[in-house]
Regions:
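Conserved N-terminal Rossmann-fold NAD(P) cofactor-binding segment
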Residues: 1-25, 33-44
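General beta-strand structural signal in soluble alpha/beta enzymes
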Residues: 14, 80-86, 131-134
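A glycine-biased structural micro-motif
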Residues: 22, 47, 78-81
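N-terminal Rossmann-like NAD(P) cofactor-binding module of classical short-chain dehydrogenase/reductase
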Residues: 24-27, 51
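Glycine-rich, N-terminal phosphate-binding loop of Rossmann-like dinucleotide-binding domains
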Residues: 28-31, 54
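Short, conserved loop/helix-junction motifs that constitute active-site signature segments
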Residues: 41-48, 76, 99-100
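Rossmann-fold NAD(P)-binding glycine/threonine-rich loop
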Residues: 53-99
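Active-site-lining helix/loop region of Rossmann-like oxidoreductase modules
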Residues: 104-163
Length: 163
């Protein structure tokens, strides 16, 4: 993974799953089909915040009719679960988020309002402008990439000026 991480940018560091699981906040950025294996790596996700940065390029039938984020959240039942950082390609996320006096937008959604605030703070610390899209099903409708039907905000590289 180290060569792939370096190809994305100098701030991306590859970690083993075991090392990553020691963190309180974990960005889930694996091939979509692997999320269940990651979920099995801990007996309980209590006390952990999981940020789902994946996109499921699978038919909705494979997701039990749920947005991909709600489907994935079912595997991390005791975690604080937030969908975010998924609507832009990795190279864009690795680039400087401050552009022409504005901050690159990242969208966040969660069914747990208490989980969003620390993830929004992390996004700001990284230089992004977090925009809350509501609950997982609301955000999922706006940023999904599924077959030929894509959400209106997927891959939109937006900027927010300081106010």
């Amino acid at each position: 993974m180290a060569p792939q991480a370096r190809a994305i940018g100098p701030t991306v560091v590859a970690k083993s799953l075991r090392d990553a699981l020691e963190a309180d906040t974990i960005i889930l950025a694996v091939p979509f089909g692997e999320h269940r294996e990651v979920a099995k790596a801990l007996p309980s996700w209590k006390g952990k915040t999981v940020i789902d940065a994946m996109n499921a390029l699978v038919p909705v039938e494979e997701l039990d009719g749920l947005p991909s984020s709600a489907f994935v959240a079912n595997s991390f039942t005791s975690a604080k679960f937030v969908k975010g950082f998924n609507h832009l390609v990795a190279a864009t996320l690795a680039a400087d988020p401050v552009v022409e006096g504005g901050h690159r937008v990242v969208f966040l959604s969660s069914d747990d309002e208490d989980a969003i605030a620390p993830v929004a703070a992390l996004a700001k610390q990284l230089g992004f402008a977090p925009v809350k899209l509501g609950k997982l099903n609301e955000g999922g409708a706006l940023v999904h990439a599924r077959g030929r039907t894509w959400g209106q905000l997927i891959f939109q590289d937006l900027f927010k000026k300081e106010q």
